[in-house]
């Protein structure tokens, strides 16, 4: 079988074979499709910068009430007409915008979901930090890249004592905590749709940031008691935010390091929302053991995050999150099977995969003690 694959690879790599295929109607369609796919991989960074330019000009929100002429968009954005037209044409070509009647520009099928979508917009803007670290991929892969931007953005992944001490400082953690809170609806809505939280008495959200997920769960299950555990600087931010809403003031907050400190007891459900892919296997085992210890018999653990080898979205795991987490300096995307293996190792059982409407945002696992 390997010999057959080697022969196939050599054949496809041969330029004479490629030229011959291009002249045969049936094979030409396949060759064109693969050429287009390869071009999109090569041009992906350019596409991302077109998207970023549209975001920074607030184009999608400008067009939310209907299509506009080039002149009208120019007046709103402040760019000169020629470069603006070039950007608009580029955005049309990748389905961010559409040409409408009378040469007006309207929202495209990929641009419309970005209207007033603070979660996606925050992640698109955040990618400028990631791209700095990806400038030289071999330097990153070799482990020789110094002063990584993502590592500084996420201080909790650093082993530097000064960075670790800074986690008690609200100002130091605010940047990444705000991004997590703003982008969390991408995952939170999927989780709440996948699971009925009202069957539980008390929920502890570990690594719960500023309480965005707990607030979303409250809309579904208002009688559920809520607790939050995160780093000291983060929970101080959360506590301040909770003062603005009387219902949120009932959330109990606990500051600490979930690799070193015991988790609070009393919850019959614990959630990990976009947490474990940030950490290596040994740290994940420590965290899962701590959660298992904190839960009563029959208690539940719900894990939700993007996972490797997600059906219909294979590049999302190993390609996107694999390189993102490598630049970040810790963690890796895991398959459902790998997460299940880690959980079973510490004593969890009855692992169920819950339905997720958008698995590209998160897959959802439910585990029992």
Summary of predicted features, one role per range:
Residues 17, 21-201:
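Conserved Class I S-adenosyl-L-methionine-dependent methyltransferase catalytic core
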Residues 104-106, 309, 357-358:
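Conserved beta-strand edge residues that scaffold enzyme active sites
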Residues 116-313, 350, 360-363:
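Conserved adenosyl
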Residues 1-16:
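Eukaryotic partner-binding/assembly regions in large regulatory complexes
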Residues 347-369:
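Core SAM-dependent methyltransferase catalytic element
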Residues 302-346, 352:
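C-terminal alpha-helical "lid/dimerization" subdomain adjacent to the S-adenosyl-L-methionine
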């Amino acid at each position: 079988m390997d010999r057959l694959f080697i022969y196939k690879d050599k054949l496809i790599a041969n330029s004479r074979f490629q030229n011959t295929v291009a002249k045969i109607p049936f094979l030409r369609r396949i060759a064109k499709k693969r050429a287009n796919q390869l071009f999109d991989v090569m041009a992906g960074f350019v596409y991302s910068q077109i998207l970023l330019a549209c975001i920074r000009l607030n184009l999608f929100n400008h067009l939310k009430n209907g299509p506009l002429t080039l002149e009208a968009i120019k007046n709103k954005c402040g760019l000169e007409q020629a470069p603006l037209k070039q950007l608009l044409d580029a955005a049309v070509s990748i389905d961010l915008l559409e040409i409408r009647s009378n040469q007006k520009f309207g929202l495209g099928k990929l641009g419309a979901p970005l209207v007033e979508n603070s979660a996606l917009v925050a992640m698109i803007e955040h990618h400028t930090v990631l791209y700095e670290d990806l400038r030289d991929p071999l330097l990153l892969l070799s482990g020789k890249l110094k002063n990584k931007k993502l590592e500084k953005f996420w201080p909790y992944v650093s082993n530097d004592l000064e960075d670790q001490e800074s986690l008690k400082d609200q100002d130091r953690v605010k940047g990444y905590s705000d991004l997590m809170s703003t982008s969390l609806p991408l995952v939170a809505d999927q989780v709440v749709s996948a699971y009925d939280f009202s069957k539980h008495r008390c929920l502890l959200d570990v690594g719960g940031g500023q309480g965005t997920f707990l607030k979303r769960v409250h809309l579904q299950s208002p009688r559920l008691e809520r607790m939050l555990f995160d780093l000291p600087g983060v929970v101080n931010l959360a506590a301040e935010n909770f003062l603005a809403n009387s219902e949120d003031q009932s959330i109990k907050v606990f500051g600490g390091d979930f690799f070193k400190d015991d988790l609070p007891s009393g919850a019959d459900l614990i959630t990990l929302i976009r947490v474990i892919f940030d950490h290596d296997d040994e740290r994940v085992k420590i965290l899962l053991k701590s959660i298992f210890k904190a839960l009563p018999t029959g208690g539940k653990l719900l894990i939700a995050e993007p996972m490797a080898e997600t059906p219909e979205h294979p590049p999302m795991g190993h390609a996107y999150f694999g390189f993102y987490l490598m630049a970040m300096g810790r963690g890796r995307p895991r398959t459902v099977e790998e997460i299940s293996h880690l959980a079973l190792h510490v004593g969890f059982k009855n692992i169920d995969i819950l339905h997720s409407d958008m698995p590209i945002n998160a897959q959802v696992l439910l585990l029992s003690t």
